[in-house]
């Protein structure tokens, strides 16, 4: 099995090719050995795949359906990002990244879902997609694999997804973020058409984006027989996912949070969700690493300042491979933004020195960020002992 991070020139791959040995991709192996014959519930989209998949897994598990799962994060309460399950149902995070060096289709075309959530669609993965239209074509390929009696659950507020379905759809379609379909209002009241199904007000996951993620999960669960009221009720006990507004610790009155956000839209939504929890008077210190291939290329740099504007202080780490100027991109934020390119520990010390009791430090990266959350907590502890 050859992962999509392995390319020509890799010594082991070259040996496999030289010997004429059989090989396959991870998604193809998964399709043939795990997903075949099962009711696959796939969650696709630029944002929210991991959280929505985890919510759906939680709902189905609470309903006693014992699904399998493969998710790009660890849902709290499962202790693992994958499990075989004990039923025909399988929840999978459906990623649009390419499959392997020999198969440049998106991974999700291998999964053959019976129920598919198309959560949202924006330009991303600038290292492999020339433009948004190229990604839309891959989503169209996913839709083409869904049977006539399958269900596509689509975000009605996405023009890109409108274009995807306009290319052709042969399956049942339900919309969310639609007054005629599934909707959730600012008070987190869920409706199907005009009929109230329940309230997400007690769901721990913060932010309107998570209310919309939950809405899609409820719709998908309904497709396999879970009553919406039961699904909504079960989300009251949804504990979240590792690295999605995950509290890593508190020290000297400062809370340190880790999040996977790396696309400007996700950064903005994450800060908005956190702001909703801490209030307007509390300070948010945003610590961001532009680490994804798209961010390293600078494709989204002009959107970065706007996505961070609701933070009170911004620290941007310029790591290896970032060949554009983050300081220039953050100029619209004025003096509240700083760019750093030294050792991670020195950045952690700088953040800890700036933090005051009552502040929340939000660290965002799609990588480990050098363990910065733990480092900040350690420096906060040292600073507290020195006082």
Name each model feature, range by range.
Residues 37-41, 193-203, 249-254:
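Glycine/charged-rich beta-loop-alpha catalytic/anionic-binding loops adjacent to active sites
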Residues 7, 109-123, 199-240:
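A conserved, hydrophobic alpha-helical segment in the catalytic core
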Residues 1, 42, 91-93, 117, ...:
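Structural motif
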Residues 140, 167-172, 216-387:
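ATP-dependent carboxylate-amine ligase
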Residues 33, 77-78, 183, 238, ...:
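Generic structural signal for helix capping and beta-alpha/helix-loop junctions
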Residues 43-51, 94, 189-201, 336-339, ...:
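A polyampholytic, Gly/Pro-enriched intrinsically disordered region
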Residues 4-154, 160-171, 215:
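Phosphate-binding loop of NTP-binding sites
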Residues 24-31, 69-73, 168-187, 202-208, ...:
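Beta-strand->loop->alpha-helix junctions that form or flank phosphate-binding loops
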